Amino acid sequence: MYSVIKTAVVCGFESLPVKVETDVSDGMPSFDMVGFLTSEVKEARERVRTALKNAGFRLPAKKITINLTPADVRKSGTGCDLPMAASVLAAFGFLDEHILSNYLLLGEVGLNSSILPTKGVLSAAVLAQKEGMQGIVVPWENAREAAILDTVKVIPVKNLKEFVQICQQELPETCFYREQQEIWKTEYDVDFSELRGQPMLRRACEIAVSGMHNLLMMGPPGSGKTMAAKRIPTILPELSREEKLELSQIYSLCGLLEQERIIQNERPFRIPHNTVTAQALVGGGKQPHPGEISLAHHGILFLDELAEFKPGILDVLREPLEEKKVHISRVGGS
């Protein structure tokens, strides 16, 4: 018995398509997983097995083998739990995998069979749109985030039993409710007009914004440098929908999107501490993640007390300032 379910894994700032293959055969009962997996993905074996038991699915004593392909892509995160569980259920005949052939599945599974929220749902929804897929199945808490895209059907689920019941019926035609006009609204808590006095500083900020220049502010403490910098995003042009979506994908991968504000509508203002490391500033790590420069994309990166930063940290800024991009090389890719 064989089944395949489609999902996605995060790689850098985007999601890559992954297939979850499950084979069930006779032999010594076992549950094996392969496919270049990180520790959190390997731990899904116990989560999925226990969740299926607590959901009321009694699996026969068989040899179960799960493969996540392509094998040369490192799989990380907990979003593969739901597609693994679905693939096992399909292999044992509890649901028809062909119903889900045009859907992307993403979600973490709890031991009580509940479907828990995960990171990178918006990026996975964008991937589903690019691949021409019909929809995406996500945890209920991530539904509003995935529903940003009009062309992708979003099916939210709360637990495995509900998921199987939905799959056994005809998948709903209606998506999760979208408040399209509200989610794209731009609102700032501050405004540049609140900056009183300081005509030279105001003029310098306006010139820097007009030409998209870098700006160096010097002055005694309490003269209004930080106050002015925090209000610069309010006089920048409003982000386009494409820019908002691109920025929201970055924040989704970092788990920074709020349930109440699923779109990053405002230009970001990032102010790292002067003790920040090079990795935290430009991003990186064994599993590359965005740094402060990437989180300030389309916005403002404010280095307060510039002289307090280590020279090596300031040297790291040279390439991003000149090339307008961050390039990180790792053993597994760049």
Regions flagged by a language model, labelled:
Residues 218-220, 286-293, 306, 323-334:
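Conserved Walker
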Residues 47, 51, 84, 123-127, ...:
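Alpha-helical scaffold elements adjacent to nucleotide-binding pockets in ATP/GTP-utilizing enzyme cores
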Residues 216-261, 318, 323:
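Walker A/P-loop
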Residues 273, 289-322:
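Conserved AAA+/SF3 P-loop NTPase catalytic/coupling segment centered on the Walker-B
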Residues 170-207, 211, 238-293:
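P-loop NTPase nucleotide-binding/switch module
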Residues 134, 213, 297-300, 323-327:
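Loop/turn-to-beta-strand initiation segments
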